[in-house]
Swiss-Prot record:
Protein's name according to its UniProt entry: UDP-N-acetylenolpyruvoylglucosamine reductase
Any single GO CC term annotated in Swiss-Prot or TrEMBL for this entry: cytosol
Keywords linked to the UniProt accession: Cell cycle, Cell division, Cell shape, Cell wall biogenesis/degradation, Cytoplasm, FAD, Flavoprotein, NADP, Oxidoreductase, Peptidoglycan synthesis
Organism: Listeria innocua serovar 6a (strain ATCC BAA-680 / CLIP 11262)
InterPro entries: FAD-bd_PCMH, FAD-bd_PCMH-like_sf, FAD-bd_PCMH_sub1, FAD-bd_PCMH_sub2, MurB, MurB_C, MurB_C_sf, Oxid_FAD_bind_N
Record localization: Cytoplasm
EC code(s) of this entry: 1.3.1.98
Active site (catalytic residues): R170, S220 (proton donor), E290
HAMAP family assigned: MurB (MF_00037)
Family the entry assigns: Belongs to the MurB family.
Gene Ontology MF, one: FAD binding
Length: 298
């Protein structure tokens, strides 16, 4: 794998890179090989090479709804953060995989285009948002997604239309097929900029009031169980404020687990398991994680 640097001298590649620098929890071990392509073509080159040489491949976006285990990740990590372009075409916006969802929503506001207001505070990348059909406050990415350009695991380029992008709550075809998102096209509607801004301000105020934005966290930890709210179940289980190591069930919103100082990924995972077990015993409800957990134990 170390041959990658010689094979691709034009692409930024780091060895044994600490992944805690790239996750919102500020936890995670090291990557064997950490690749930062600047273009779609460079991304395609790396993905194809990994496939041909049977190298394990992991795609990393903004690291916001993610826990990377303390043992890190073997093989090659491709970090798409440098694919940042956002542009307008009529009433559509085309955003590359590494563009931040927040920046894309702000771009839509600046262009007087409505439809992405719900995303104004979601801290993920476009690629990650498509992967999990991210949403908040009644809106989901799939509501406005028109098309996506993806790579297959073998490096084949595909253009997927809306009809091919079947999506459900925190699920998408992209995740199911392990596609690598390169860009996304959103169909929006013209609207008065002040109206869009007012909606964003309202949602931002709600987010700031309810979410522990002052601490590192992985966002909403659990999916919403049918007929319940995860945060309410956790609160009613007496777990709000519960601490394991440096990880704590947030005092502000029980659906979040925050890093109050020096937390490890293992702390997070132990606390998640404890919450799941307690809620299962008290309410006979299974809490399924929304946060993605990858990597190896230390």
């Amino acid at each position: 794998m170390n041959n990658l640097q010689a094979q691709f001298p034009h692409i930024a590649i780091k060895l044994n890179e600490p992944l805690s620098k790239y996750t919102y929890t500020k936890t995670g071990g090291n990557a064997d090989v950490f690749v930062m392509p600047k273009t779609i073509e460079e991304t395609k080159e790396i993905v194809t090479y990994c496939h041909q040489n049977k190298l394990p491949l992991t795609i990393l976006g903004n690291g916001s709804n993610l826990i990377i285990k303390d043992g890190g990740i073997r093989g090659v990590i491709v970090h798409l953060d440098l694919l940042q372009s956002i542009e307008r075409k009529n009433t559509q916006i085309i955003a590359m995989s590494g563009a931040k969802l927040i920046d894309t929503a702000k771009f839509a506001l600046d262009e007087s285009l409505s439809g992405l207001e719900f995303a104004c505070g979601i801290p993920g990348s476009i690629g990650g948002a498509l992967h999990m059909n991210a949403g908040a406050y009644g809106g989901e990415i799939s509501d406005v997604l028109e098309a996506a350009t993806v790579l297959t695991q073998s490096g084949e380029l595909k253009k997927l239309k809306r009809s091919e992008l079947k999506a459900a709550y925190r699920f998408s075809t992209i995740a199911e097929k392990k596609y690598i998102v390169l860009d996304a096209t959103f169909s929006l509607e013209l609207e008065d900029k002040n109206i869009i801004q007012a909606k964003m301000d309202e949602l931002t105020a709600l987010r700031e009031a309810k979410q522990p934005l002052e601490y590192p966290s992985c966002g909403s930890v659990f999916k919403r169980p049918p007929g319940h709210f995860a945060g309410k179940l956790i609160q009613d289980s007496g777990l709000q404020g519960h601490i394991i190591g440096g990880a704590q069930v947030s005092l502000k919103h029980a659906g979040f687990i925050v890093n109050i100082g020096g937390a490890t990924a293992t702390d997070y995972m132990n606390l998640i398991a404890h919450v799941q077990q307690t809620v299962r015993e008290k309410f006979d409800v299974e809490l399924e994680t929304e946060v993605k957990i990858i990597g190896e134990d230390k």
